[in-house]
Amino acid sequence: MDGIKYAVVTDKSIRLLLKNQYTSNVESGSTRTEIKHWVELFFGVKVIAMNSHRLPGKGRRMRPIMGHTMHYRRMIITLQPGYSIPPLRKKRT
């Protein structure tokens, strides 16, 4: 699982869990087909849709030199009904 970095936990990503959509940051060089293959193989789920967007890096200053952090990609992965990713499953009360 070299392409998937980590799951994202924000207000929007928590709302998307109710729609069976999972959000994670991935390597910027990974393709959609690679990510889909990794998710289906590693978690044993069926992916029906994937949305992605590129987030810009942040500016960093070290005295007179202005640098920046690397940009990254975020994927929103929609699973077929009945499938879920166990570590991110919402607890029902």
Curated annotation (Swiss-Prot):
This is Large ribosomal subunit protein uL23cz/uL23cy. It is found in: Plastid, Chloroplast. It comes from the Eukaryota. The keyword Plastid applies. One of its GO terms (biological process) is translation. Its main location: plastid. Part of the 50S ribosomal subunit. Belongs to the universal ribosomal protein uL23 family. Keywords: Chloroplast, Plastid, Ribonucleoprotein, Ribosomal protein, RNA-binding, rRNA-binding. Coiled coil: none annotated. It comes from Populus alba (White poplar). Binds to 23S rRNA.
